[in-house]
Structures are given as C-alpha cells and as structure tokens.
Amino acid sequence: MTTKPFFDAARVIAGGKLTQAQVDDLNKVVEKLAPSGKTTSDVGIDLITSFEGTRFNAYDDGVGVWTIGFGTIKYPNGVRVKKGDTCTEQQAETYLKNDLTKFEVAINKLVKVPLTQNQFDALASFTYNLGETNLANSTLLKKLNKSDYQGAADQFLVWNRAGGKVMKGLVRRREAERALFLKK
C-alpha cells in the first residue's frame, strides 16, 4: 500500500503540516490498518461516487442521517456530520478515501473466499452505502463465504430499502452492484 495519499489526507485534516511525532503515530496506524488484501479500483470508486453524488453542504439523506461529500456520515476523527457543516472538494475526497479504507479492511476481514476485483468493488459499494455491520450480518456474506457466488449476487437486490421504503435509487444501485459482481 502506498502511504502518500494517507499522509496527504492527514495533512489536509491537520491544517497543512504534521509534526514528526504525528508522522510516527500515523505510521503505526498505517501498519495496523493496511489492507492485507484487495483495495477498491477506479471502477469501484466510480460506482460509489456515481450513486453517492457530491455535496459540499451537509444534507439529510432522507432518513435522518446528515451526510456530506461523497456520502460521508462521520469525519475521520469520528465526529458525526451535522446540519450546517461544509467541506471543500479536497476534503470530500479525503473523507471518501478514509471511509473506503475502513470498508476495505472490513471486507478483507469478513470475506473468506477468493474475490475478483469486480466482486470486491461491488462489495465496496455495498458496504460504503450500508456499513460494515450490515455486511457482517447479511445473508449475502453467508452465501458468499459458502462459495455460493450466484446466491450472494442475488442478495444485493434485497437491500433496496431506506426507512422501510423501497427507494428507486437503491434499486438501481443494487442492480449495478449485482451486475458488477457477476461481470467476468
């Protein structure tokens, strides 16, 4: 894993500069969190950003969750996004990278079978949208870890609701994730 993007993001969050002590501490974090498996490709990032969109002013996602940038709900420091928050394009990209890293680590930890890059990217989009807990407790993951790739693919389509209601945007997103997961 190249650490330059991580440290670039940390510099933005810190206001431009890092002390040597901060660099040393961040190096320890990188060593612990560096994914031991796959990372999201440009195809996966494009899928995520095409459905998330980009908003530089915090907004309610329709079910009471304040969101900013490319769908970020918590900043890298753990603080939740709230009404009135704003960000720059560079900050939005930093938040996206931070969120993706967390979800990549989770996917690499939870999935026990080989994945193609397309399958990983589809899972990255799914997990970015729904969170690690939903992936961890899903029938999708259970089927996948039993090498039932088709059954896992079909499970994407189940996750099309927000606030108990079927959402057209989620139907489209799950169909796109399923198609990518099955793509050779």
Where are the language model's segments positioned?
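Short alpha-helix boundary/capping elements
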Residues: T127-E132
